[in-house]
Amino acid sequence: MNATLTRVNAIFNRDLALHLNLIANNAILIYTNASTDPYSPANIGASGTWNLELQRDLTSKIGNANYDIGHLFGATGGGGNAGCIGCVCQNPISSTDLAKGSGYTSPADGKPEGDTFDIDFVAHEMGHQLGANHTFSHEIEGTGVNVEPGGGSTIMAYAGVTDYNVQSHSDDYFAYA
């Protein structure tokens, strides 16, 4: 977690003048036994149930007033999901709301580490939580920021993921759109 946050912070600080800190009592949120953690198995959780499970875990254990953005680092499952776009600092209104604590990233290879994990996934999903939309142009989403050729090449693109790849992995910066 620390290595990933250090890598992501270098980019967020440079590009967004933003610095993220781990909360002091984060140890109560670290689970090392899948049979006792509050999350669905990867084959179910990575399909979207982790969003609400994380939001509920953060709300009950940390309290909404004690954090601004919550993001689950899974061990395996593949991909990620922000839960919402531009929801940083937004508390859930009900127990079924996806708000500031509903993002997750989980690698397909069981190795939540390195630039592919940190940049292509964590920074990308946190970018959504901070309000960023996709910048690739192989598919127009109607957000007005689809400015990069094909699958794109920056953090909010889908480098290496589409049939229209420009490159295999994201460059470590945000496109200006």
For the regions a protein language model found, what residue spans apply to each?
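Extracellular (secreted or membrane-anchored) zinc-dependent metallopeptidases
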Residues: 1-177
